[in-house]
Amino acid sequence: MADNTVTDVKKLSFERAIEELESIVKRLEDGKVPLEESVAIYERGEALKRRCEELLRQAEARVEKITTDASGRATGVAPLDVQ
């Protein structure tokens, strides 16, 4: 995969990367893509998947939960414990 392709992926929004990844999956599932092209778009799909995972990790790190006191009043925020 060319370096400029990886650079292009790194500039994509989550929504655009998912949209393109879904398109690649559909093309591969259809089975009408020549082998060489299949390998190339599979590699692009892998880069898109990594981009989406990276953006999700960043979003998760920014999500916080509101902490409250015994009476239920907000007292601040803490990292969200996602499990």
UniProtKB/Swiss-Prot annotation:
One of its GO terms (biological process) is DNA catabolic process. One of its GO terms (cellular component) is exodeoxyribonuclease VII complex. Its main location: cytoplasm. Keywords: Cytoplasm, Exonuclease, Hydrolase, Nuclease. The keyword Protease does not apply. InterPro entries: Exonuc_VII_S, Exonuc_VII_ssu_sf. It catalyses: Exonucleolytic cleavage in either 5'- to 3'- or 3'- to 5'-direction to yield nucleoside 5'-phosphates. It comes from the Bacteria. It is found in: Cytoplasm. Its EC number is 3.1.11.6. Bidirectionally degrades single-stranded DNA into large acid-insoluble oligonucleotides, which are then degraded further into small acid-soluble oligonucleotides. Belongs to the XseB family. HAMAP family: Exonuc_7_S. PANTHER family: EXODEOXYRIBONUCLEASE 7 SMALL SUBUNIT (PTHR34137:SF1). Heterooligomer composed of large and small subunits. This is Exodeoxyribonuclease 7 small subunit. It comes from Bradyrhizobium sp. (strain BTAi1 / ATCC BAA-1182).
